[in-house]
Structure formats: structure tokens, C-alpha cells
């Protein structure tokens, strides 16, 4: 790959903006696309994302557009950073404008709504089996990445050369380390399941259960992640890395996590809608909980923590009763 390669980042929220800022700082021609022309005009005028990253100015050469055709045709690499529930929709909109050399990656963490399918399956259904695909995942908060604080992630792809190219594209020796990982399934799965467990960690803390309970929940949540991964053919080692344990610990323990804050609000007695409104941004874990529930049921995998969180969010179960249900399960070996 050349020293510089053009890339279009699709999704101008906090994480999409942070990735675009990092890529532009790396010297790569970067175009940031947002679906709302008024929002993009505001970003262009302010030269920063005032809503989410007000203290981080856009690099001078970072370009912005609300024209999807322009964004897709401007670069051979597309990086989708959109909520999981619109992932397939955005790919369908992208498809008519694809270049012959287009390769597609995503930083979206989640599964397909109403089916629980992996995003790779959604992408292949829309784009066919020949399109090179990749996923980036790991413990990253947008504010810290945009501020240039030390960060590490992993990238996996259907094509080894694409994974290598993406790692070179994203890697910044000063602050951003990128590892390649051959486990395409595991990286996708870790990002979805950790969101659910993070809601559980917030619930536990909101109920005042303390550090012991939070740590037990993280540890057993990792087991559930590995269990589901094994059923889908993922490598168990992946879940001990950036996209598994790393992302899980980050989102379960730091209040920058929307999923954790959502759980905290629920644990404090607020209902789902009120808690969601307080966050003011997409809480991916809310939808991920249903998606993981569907996927686990289809695979016949027992995930008791994720199941109790599903009951709280979608069946109105009292959070304290859900915690009691977990603690009162039959004795078993670790």
C-alpha cells in the first residue's frame, strides 16, 4: 500500500469523527460523510464536532460531505461507523456508487436487528461474496482517540492484505496502535456482547452492589462471550484480546461508556425511555441485547447474564429481581 491512501469515513457521530480526525492527522486524504446536510454544514462551519468533541478541531485537510455518491467514489477504502440497526440500509445506499477497487471496513459494534445475524452476513447479502470486508474493534472512547491519547485496537478481514493495509492506514506510532487478528467472527462478536455486559455492570453499580459484584459480572460475562464465540467458530484467544477482554473492561468500568451509564440509570430506578433520553446518543447495547438474545437462542447457547438483561430491558423485569435470579442459580463448577 502507498504511504498515503484515500479513505471515506461514513458516519459523522462521535466515533466516526474521532476516526476521521485520527486518519487525517496521519496524512491520509480523508472525507467524512454525514447523512444530515444541516449537521454536515454545521460541522464544516465550526470545523469541529461541537456536540461530542468540542475541544478537538478538525485537521485543516479533513473534508466533509453529505453527498454519499461523492464519499463512496472519492476513496478505495470505506469505513462505516454507523449504528448497527442502519448498517444494512447504508450498505444498500452505498452499493450503486461502488468503485471497482472499493474495499469496505466497519467500526460498528452490533448485530443485525430482528435476526441477530453477524454484520458480515448482512454485508455479503447486500454486496456479494467477493467484496473484501474488514472490521475494527477494541477498547476505544471517541474523546480519547480524538485527543491523541494512547489507544490500541484490532483489525480482522476476509482478506489478509486488507487487514494489513488497514492496520498501516490507522496506525499512528505516537498514539494509535493497531493489531491484526485472523478471527473475523470473533472481533464482530466481542463488540456486540460487551455492550450487553456493560449495561449489566451499570445496573449492578446503580443498585449499589459494589466492586465485587461488578468484577464477577465482567468475568462471567467474558465466559458467556467465549461460549457464544465457540458456537460460531470464533477463536477463544480473541476474547482475551483487545476486542474481547479489553473492550469489556473499558465499557464496564468507565462512565464514558453510554451502555454503562444507561445501566446505571436503570439501576437507580429509571425506566428504559427515561434512561435512554438522559444519554442523548445511540445506546447500541439496548438493541444488542435483543440481537444477542436471538443469536444465543438460535445457537442453543446458555447466556444467563445476557438473558436477565434482556428480561429487564424488554420484559420489564425488576433489576434487583434479575440480580437475585442470577445469584440463586444452581451451584456449578467454574
From Swiss-Prot:
Its EC number is 1.1.1.94. The active site is at residue 194. GO terms for biological process: carbohydrate metabolic process; glycerol-3-phosphate biosynthetic process; glycerol-3-phosphate catabolic process; glycerophospholipid biosynthetic process. InterPro entries: 6-PGluconate_DH-like_C_sf, 6PGD_dom2, G3P_DH_NAD-dep, G3P_DH_NAD-dep_C, G3P_DH_NAD-dep_N, NAD(P)-bd_dom_sf. Pathway: Membrane lipid metabolism; glycerophospholipid metabolism. It comes from the Bacteria. It is found in: Cytoplasm. Sn-glycerol 3-phosphate binds at residues 109, 138, 140, 194, 247, 257-259. It catalyses: sn-glycerol 3-phosphate + NAD(+) = dihydroxyacetone phosphate + NADH + H(+); sn-glycerol 3-phosphate + NADP(+) = dihydroxyacetone phosphate + NADPH + H(+). GO terms for molecular function: glycerol-3-phosphate dehydrogenase [NAD(P)+] activity; NAD binding. NADPH binds at residues 14-15, 35, 109, 142, 258, 282, 284. Catalyzes the reduction of the glycolytic intermediate dihydroxyacetone phosphate (DHAP) to sn-glycerol 3-phosphate (G3P), the key precursor for phospholipid synthesis. Belongs to the NAD-dependent glycerol-3-phosphate dehydrogenase family. This is Glycerol-3-phosphate dehydrogenase [NAD(P)+]. It comes from Aeromonas hydrophila subsp. hydrophila (strain ATCC 7966 / DSM 30187 / BCRC 13018 / CCUG 14551 / JCM 1027 / KCTC 2358 / NCIMB 9240 / NCTC 8049).
Amino acid at each position: 500500500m502507498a504511504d498515503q491512501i484515500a479513505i471515506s469515513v461514513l458516519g459523522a457521530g462521535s466515533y466516526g469523527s474521532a476516526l476521521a480526525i485520527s486518519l487525517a492527522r496521519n496524512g491520509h486524504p480523508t472525507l467524512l460523510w454525514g447523512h444530515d446536510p444541516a449537521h454536515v454544514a454545521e460541522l464544516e462551519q465550526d470545523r469541529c464536532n461541537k456536540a461530542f468533541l468540542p475541544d478537538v478541531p478538525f485537521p485543516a485537510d479533513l473534508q466533509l460531505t453529505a453527498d454519499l455518491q461523492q464519499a463512496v467514489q472519492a476513496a478505495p477504502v470505506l469505513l462505516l461507523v454507523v449504528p448497527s440497526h442502519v448498517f444494512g440500509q447504508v450498505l444498500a445506499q452505498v452499493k450503486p456508487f461502488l468503485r471497482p477497487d472499493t474495499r469496505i471496513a466497519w467500526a460498528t459494534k452490533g448485530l443485525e436487528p430482528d435476526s441477530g445475524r453477524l454484520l458480515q452476513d448482512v454485508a455479503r447479502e447486500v454486496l456479494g461474496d467477493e467484496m473484501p470486508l474488514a472490521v475494527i474493534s477494541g477498547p476505544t472512547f471517541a474523546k480519547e482517540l480524538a485527543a491523541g491519547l494512547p489507544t490500541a485496537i484490532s483489525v480482522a478481514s476476509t482478506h489478509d492484505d486488507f487487514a494489513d493495509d488497514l492496520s498501516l492506514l490507522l496506525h499512528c506510532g505516537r498514539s494509535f496502535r493497531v493489531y491484526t487478528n485472523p478471527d473475523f467472527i470473533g472481533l464482530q462478536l466481542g463488540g456486540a456482547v460487551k455492550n450487553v455486559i456493560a449495561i449489566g455492570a451499570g445496573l449492578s453499580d446503580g443498585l449499589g452492589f459494589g466492586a465485587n459484584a461488578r468484577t464477577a459480572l465482567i468475568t462471567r460475562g467474558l465466559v458467556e462471550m467465549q461460549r457464544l464465540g465457540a458456537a460460531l467458530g470464533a477463536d477463544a484467544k480473541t476474547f482475551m484480546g483487545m476486542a474481547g477482554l479489553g473492550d469489556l473492561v473499558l465499557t464496564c468500568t468507565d462512565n464514558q461508556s453510554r451502555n454503562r451509564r444507561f445501566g446505571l440509570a436503570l439501576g437507580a430506578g429509571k425506566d428504559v425511555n427515561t434512561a435512554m433520553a438522559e444519554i442523548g446518543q445511540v445506546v447500541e447495547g439496548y438493541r444488542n441485547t435483543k440481537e444477542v438474545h436471538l443469536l444465543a437462542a438460535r445457537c442453543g447457547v446458555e447466556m444467563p447474564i445476557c438473558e436477565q438483561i434482556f428480561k429487564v430491558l424488554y420484559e420489564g423485569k425488576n433489576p434487583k429481581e434479575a440480580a437475585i435470579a442470577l445469584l440463586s442459580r444452581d451451584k456449578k463448577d467454574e
